[in-house]
């Protein structure tokens, strides 16, 4: 992440033969346009801070209109669903922000198409420049930066860079290129960079808000967005951002430190007694349920659990959901829990990561944690490093963003997204797109991202993928149903929708069972979080011709407590089953007010369900020899086999 802004700043020298120098005037508004490299540069704050420092007397404003995955052929800024209806096309958007200057950067991701598409690139870029320059705007072209991925084929990048230079010369435009930092402006001070980052964060929350499907799209008339209980509507709250942005800009030019951030509003259920919730459970015969962790260990609004090879539990929590409050900086967390004495209850809790924003996807691997939040996949390593691996995932609906990360038997990371989402993600092999609902398969080493079920050809809101012992994958739908996705699937757009093999219901979180602590009849069965029914349901996938059908069994766990909301269920290293309890009276995204006062923001539970009398010591895989790890691949414990890989 640090490399991209440095490289981008290093390209900003003025070509001596340019027809016009990059000089900003009083009243100028600079619009940045481009793809992921421009998005990252804006997020870092260093590019804008350097320009601000050099032109402080002119007090220019900066507006980021860059969008991940944007190319000269298609720009999500104007082309994504509901953007044009809400903000208009390029002409309307540039007028709306008052742009007098445009800095555009394209050509890097397009170069992966090779020399054969150079003519199409020149033509499309020319047409886009005509739109950007309309009304007399001054346009500057930024040369394509180098790839940050060693896997990318950069053989045609020089050809596309020359094409951009030729285009600039033919139009008499300034080309920003070379290896100098912004025209001698020097490295901006950290305080200025921090202030610019904060302003940009506010701008992003305004211009590309999470849940904009509920703001401008086909869900804008539902309960989520309406005013209630004396509180503003979603749109009314969104309209409070421009004054916050203006105040942040004033602080930048006055040399003031960023204003203290307001504290988020946090409500909670008045009666959240764990003993009462425990007494409300009915558990499958032969099993018992106990509390592993709750809000006393910091667990509030938990979304998922995973473990590392040492058996430490990681819990992703989000009290930001469903929508960030204006001006508030999200601080969702991942906690690391340890059961040191093996009594089935967490006795140590620490914050592994904070400052997250609705981390709906999480999986442990490769000496760190993969996190999906909003538009990004992050990798958080054990040493405290944080890196954006990929970005450009959609955020049009915060309960349908990328979620439920899980490793496949082949070592790939699978996850879903819902129908309110459009993702266009730049990768070393080009832009990977998924329109509406579907599932992704990521090979982290190559950053190869494949999309399945493009254009809503399966579940409407996938919230869990699980694999049986033969590699067959089963996807559950938060809007209802179970779907089978064959291992032979390829990333193509289907016109025939997958059949639903399981009855409708609100499912969130799925696990395939395989542990010596469980009865033989349960091996290979599946558990799902049936959150609307306040239970953990159980089914078997039975052969049915070339596919499968679902046969439902008696639920593992049921509750008469309306706040019990199982949203993830996983086998642990000890052979017990762990249930993530969101603990909330609110169950639906669109059909409950986004600031509903009864949304519980302070509680959450992790329940442990174990077979009576069954014990299984957690394996010591971190210190195991290679021979022991190979032997662990033969273990009847699915958890052990997966972690041994």
Regions found by a protein language model. Name each.
Residues 25, 42, 183-267:
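Conserved catalytic region of serine esterases and O-acyltransferases that act on ester linkages
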Residues 29-33, 61-66, 100-106, 138-143, ...:
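Structural recognition of the beta-strand scaffold that forms the well-ordered cores
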Residues 149-179:
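Substrate-gating cap/lid alpha-helix
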Residues 61, 130, 255-634, 639-643:
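Beta-propeller domains with acidic blade repeats across secreted/periplasmic ectodomains
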Residues 18-67, 92-98, 102, 191:
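Serine-esterase "nucleophile elbow" of acetyl-processing enzymes
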Residues 1-8:
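Sec-dependent signal peptide recognition
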Residues 31, 59-97, 102-104, 108-147:
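Internal alpha/beta domain cores that form substrate/cofactor-binding pockets in large enzymes
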Residues 9-17:
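Hydrophobic h-region of N-terminal signal peptides that target proteins for export
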């Amino acid at each position: 992440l640090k490399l991209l802004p440095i490289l981008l700043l290093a390209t900003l020298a003025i070509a001596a033969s340019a027809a016009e120098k990059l000089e900003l005037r009083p009243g100028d508004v600079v619009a940045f346009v481009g793809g992921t490299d421009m998005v990252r540069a804006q997020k870092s704050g260093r590019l804008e801070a350097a320009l601000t420092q050099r032109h402080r007397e002119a007090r220019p404003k900066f507006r980021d209109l860059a969008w991940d995955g944007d190319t000269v052929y298609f720009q999500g800024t104007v082309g994504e669903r509901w953007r044009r209806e809400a903000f208009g096309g390029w002409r309307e958007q540039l007028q709306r922000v008052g742009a007098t200057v445009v800095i555009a950067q394209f050509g890097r991701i397009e170069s992966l198409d090779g020399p054969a598409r150079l003519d199409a690139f020149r033509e499309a870029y020319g047409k886009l420049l005509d739109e950007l320059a309309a009304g007399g705007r001054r346009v500057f072209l930024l040369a394509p930066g180098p790839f940050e991925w060693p896997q990318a084929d950069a053989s045609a990048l020089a050809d596309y860079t020359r094409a951009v230079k030729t285009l600039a010369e033919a139009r008499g435009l300034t080309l920003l290129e070379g290896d100098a930092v912004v025209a001698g402006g020097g490295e901006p001070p950290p305080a200025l960079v921090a202030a610019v980052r904060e302003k940009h964060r506010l701008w992003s929350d305004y211009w590309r808000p999470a849940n904009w499907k509920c703001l401008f799209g086909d869900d804008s008339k539902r309960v989520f967005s309406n005013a209630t209980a004396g509180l503003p509507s979603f749109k009314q709250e969104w309209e409070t951002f421009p004054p916050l942005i203006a105040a942040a800009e004033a602080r930048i030019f006055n040399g003031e430190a960023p204003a203290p951030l307001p504290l988020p509003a946090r409500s909670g259920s008045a009666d959240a007694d764990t003993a009462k919730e425990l007494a409300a459970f009915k558990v499958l015969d032969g099993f018992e349920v106990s509390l592993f962790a709750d809000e006393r260990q910091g667990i509030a609004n938990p979304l998922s659990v995973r473990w590392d090879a040492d058996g430490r539990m990681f819990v992703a929590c989000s009290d930001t959901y469903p929508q960030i409050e204006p001006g508030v900086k999200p601080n969702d967390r991942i906690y690391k829990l340890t059961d040191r004495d093996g009594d089935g209850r967490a006795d140590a809790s620490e914050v592994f990561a904070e400052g997250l924003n609705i981390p709906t996807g999480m999986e442990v691997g490769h000496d760190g944690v993969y996190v999906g939040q909003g538009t990004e996949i992050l990798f958080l390593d054990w040493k405290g490093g944080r890196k954006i691996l990929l970005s450009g995932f959609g955020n049009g609906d915060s309960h349908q963003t990328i979620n439920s990360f899980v490793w496949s038997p082949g070592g790939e990371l699978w996850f879903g997204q819902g129908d309110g989402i459009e993702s266009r993600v730049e990768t070393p092999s080009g832009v990977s797109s998924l329109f509406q609902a579907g599932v992704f398969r990521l090979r982290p080493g190559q950053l190869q991202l494949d999309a399945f079920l493009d254009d809503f050809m399966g579940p409407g809101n996938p919230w869990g993928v699980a694999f049986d012992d033969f590699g067959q994958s089963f996807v559950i739908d938060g809007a209802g149903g179970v779907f089978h996705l064959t291992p032979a699937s390829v990333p193509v757009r289907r016109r025939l929708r997958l059949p639903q093999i399981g009855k409708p219901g609100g499912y969130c979180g799925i696990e395939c069972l395989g542990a010596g602590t469980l009865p033989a009849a349960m091996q290979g069965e599946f558990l799902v979080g049936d959150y609307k029914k306040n239970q953990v349901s159980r089914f078997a996938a039975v052969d049915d011709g070339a596919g499968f059908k679902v046969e439902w069994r008696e639920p593992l766990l049921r509750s008469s407590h309306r706040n019990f909301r199982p949203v993830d269920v996983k086998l642990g290293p000890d052979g017990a089953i762990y249930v993530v309890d969101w603990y909330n009276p609110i169950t639906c995204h669109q059909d409950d007010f986004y600031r509903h006062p009864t949304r519980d923001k302070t509680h959450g539970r992790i329940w442990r369900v174990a077979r009576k009398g069954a014990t299984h010591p957690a394996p010591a895989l971190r210190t195991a020899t290679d021979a022991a790890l190979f032997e662990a691949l033969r273990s009847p414990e699915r958890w052990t086999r997966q972690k041994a890989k």
